[in-house]
Amino acid sequence: SGKHISTEVSFYNMDYFTKALVLFLLGFIVSCLGWLAPQSKAPKKLTWILSLSGVGMLIAGVTIRCLIQGRPPVTTLYETILFITGCCVLTAQALEYYDRRNIALTVSTFLGALGCFLSNRYELKEAVTAGDTMPSLVAVLDTNFWLSTHVTTVTLGYAAGLLAAAISHVWIFSKMLGVKKSDPSYYKSLTRMVCGTLCVGLFFSVVGTILGGIWANYSWGRFWGWDPKENGALMICLAELIILHLRM
C-alpha cells in the first residue's frame, strides 16, 4: 500500500542500523577507556547513554521492519542477526544493572557493534542476490503463529547462548592476562553471569526446539528428521546441558 511504501522509504532514509553501529562502537571505545580510569564515573555513564541509544535505534529499526512486513523479524539470516543482537544487548544491560562491574556493559557494546556490522554485510548480500532485503516468504514459512512462537523462542535461546559465550571469553582472557588476580569476586561474578545466562538460553532453546518439531509435524508429517538445522539445535541444547551439569 501507499502508506507502507512511504514508511519503507522513510525507514531506508533513517538508516537505523548504521546509526546503531556507530553508537555501539563509540560506546565500546568509551567503555575501554573507562577501564583505564576505574575511579572516574563519567565513562560508565557515557557508555550507558551510548549503549541505550544504540539498542534504541536497533529496536526502532526492527520494529518498523515488522510493521512494514506484517510478520516477526526472524525470517532471514539478516533479520535474525539483528534480532539476536538486540536480545544480547538488552540482556547484557540487565546483567550490568544488577552486577555494576562494567563487564556486561562493555560486552553489550561489543556485541552490539559486531552484530550490526555482520548484519550490514548480509544486507548487502541479500540486496545483490535477492534484489530485496524484505523478500516474500516461502509458503511453508508463511505463518505468523509459528514464526512468533518457534522461531522467536529458539532465537532468544541462541542469543542467550551467544552472550554466555562472550562473557566466558572475558573470563578466559582475564585469566590469561592476569586481570584482577587479587579480586576473586571478579571471577565469581563472571561465573554467575555465565551460568544464569546459560540457564535462560537452555530454557528457550529446549522449548523452541520442541515447538520446531511440532511445526515440522504439522507441515510435512514428521517431528524430527535429523536435518542440519535440527541437529544444530540439538547440539546447542546438549552443549548447554553439559556445561551446567559440570558446574553442578
Residue ranges and their predicted role:
Residues 181-188:
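Helix-loop-helix junctions that connect adjacent transmembrane helices in secondary transporters/permeases
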Residues 1-11:
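Soluble non-transmembrane domains of integral membrane proteins
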Residues 1, 16-71, 75-134, 143-177, ...:
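Hydrophobic cores of alpha-helical transmembrane segments in multi-pass integral membrane proteins
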